[in-house]
Amino acid sequence: MERTFVYLKPNAVRRGLVGEIIKRFEQRGIKIVALKLFWMTREQAERLYEMHKGKNFYNELIEFVTGGPVVAMVVEAPRVIEMVRHIIGNTDPLKAGTGTIRGEFALTVTKNLIHASDSKENFEREYKIFFSENEIVDYYLDVQDDI
């Protein structure tokens, strides 16, 4: 099984889309193994987006993601990195496909509702900013035999 890190940005929380987004993952057989609601600190945001430091959108992004509560999770399934990125759609909502989270609900590139790790390496780096190993719960999901 593969794992990935996902977090719902403040506008997803404020717009009441948390349940809808989680539902889309669960309906695909994706197992949530860690989940929390919290305010992201500036330090966490800067660590998460360190590769964008110096870019013209960096400060706006940091202010946005620290400006309200977020929901972070670690999810698990076969090929979950690829699957989650397919479900959420392109970073640019105008390029995101119909039926994707961003295609249906997002308005701008910066405020695109959701972030997901794009590789195993980034998952390993990103989830550790928000979760300790003992916060990840292993359990049997009934649909596991079907995936």
From Swiss-Prot:
Its main location: cytoplasm. Its cofactor is Mg(2+). It holds the Pfam family NDK. SMART domains: NDK. It comes from the Bacteria. InterPro entries: NDK-like_dom, NDK-like_dom_sf, Nucleoside_diP_kinase, Nucleoside_diP_kinase_AS. It is found in: Cytoplasm. One of its GO terms (molecular function) is metal ion binding. The keyword Nucleotide-binding applies. The active site is at H115. GO terms for cellular component: cytoplasm. GO terms for biological process: CTP biosynthetic process; GTP biosynthetic process; UTP biosynthetic process. Signal peptide: none annotated. Its EC number is 2.7.4.6. ATP binds at K9, F57, R85, T91, R102, N112. Keywords: ATP-binding, Cytoplasm, Kinase, Magnesium, Metal-binding, Nucleotide metabolism, Nucleotide-binding, Phosphoprotein, Transferase. It is an enzyme of class 2 (transferase). It catalyses: a 2'-deoxyribonucleoside 5'-diphosphate + ATP = a 2'-deoxyribonucleoside 5'-triphosphate + ADP; a ribonucleoside 5'-diphosphate + ATP = a ribonucleoside 5'-triphosphate + ADP. NCBIfam families: PRK00668.1. Homotetramer. Major role in the synthesis of nucleoside triphosphates other than ATP. The ATP gamma phosphate is transferred to the NDP beta phosphate via a ping-pong mechanism, using a phosphorylated active-site intermediate. Belongs to the NDK family. This is Nucleoside diphosphate kinase. The lineage of its organism: Bacteria, Thermotogati, Thermotogota, Thermotogae, Thermotogales. The gene is ndk.
